[in-house]
């Protein structure tokens, strides 16, 4: 019995983490066990579709993608999902298809939006004393 070719990648945004399992299959794409067409909020659904629409659905015809996402808010989770899918597709093509198709995918993704493959490294600034937040100060009175 031969093992099914598969790769595992992750995408991150703020505190949201999405792990994508990409393997040979028949074109199923699921997020937390439900189809990608049911991603909420509906307004951000096309953000999740971006990697699929950029390279064409024909590249997804013979692979299955299962994504598990935890942490963060709705928007962060959507960005983590799209990054995990894009990175998973590139990794799958590098490992099981060929280098040329991997480079084409990478070029298409990075020319459209760099954050599809590279995580956003911005993090919240720590709070300091003398104010309510990182930069906000308490009101000062002179009299």
From Swiss-Prot:
Keywords tagged on the record:
Ribonucleoprotein, Ribosomal protein
One function term, GO molecular function aspect: structural constituent of ribosome
Q: Does the keyword Ribosomal protein apply?
A: yes
User: Positions of the region Disordered?
Assistant: 123-143
Could you tell me which Pfam families the record lists for this protein? Ribosomal_S9 (PF00380)
Q: Which residues form a coiled coil?
A: none
Which InterPro entries did the record assign? Ribosomal_Su5_D2-typ_SF, Ribosomal_uS9, Ribosomal_uS9_CS, Ribsml_uS5_D2-typ_fold_subgr
Provide one Gene Ontology biological process annotation.
maturation of SSU-rRNA from tricistronic rRNA transcript (SSU-rRNA, 5.8S rRNA, LSU-rRNA)
Basic residues bias locations: 134-143
Q: Which PANTHER family match?
A: RIBOSOMAL PROTEIN S16, RIBOSOMAL PROTEIN S9
The family annotation for this protein states: Belongs to the universal ribosomal protein uS9 family.
Q: What is this protein called?
A: Small ribosomal subunit protein uS9
């Amino acid at each position: 019995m031969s093992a099914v070719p598969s790769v595992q990648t992750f995408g991150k945004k703020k505190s949201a983490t999405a792990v994508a399992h990409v393997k040979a299959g028949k074109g199923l794409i699921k997020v937390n066990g439900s189809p990608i067409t049911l991603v909420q909020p509906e307004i951000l659904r096309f953000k999740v579709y971006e990697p699929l629409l950029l390279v064409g659905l024909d590249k997804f015809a013979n692979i299955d993608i299962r994504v598990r996402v935890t942490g963060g808010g709705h928007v962060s989770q959507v960005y983590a999902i799209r990054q995990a899918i894009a990175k998973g597709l590139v990794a799958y093509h590098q490992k099981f298809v060929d280098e040329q198709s991997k480079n084409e995918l990478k070029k298409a993704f990075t020319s459209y939006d760099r954050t599809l493959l590279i995580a956003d490294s911005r993090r919240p600034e720590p709070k300091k004393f003398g104010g309510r937040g990182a930069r906000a100060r308490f009101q000062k009175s002179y009299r």
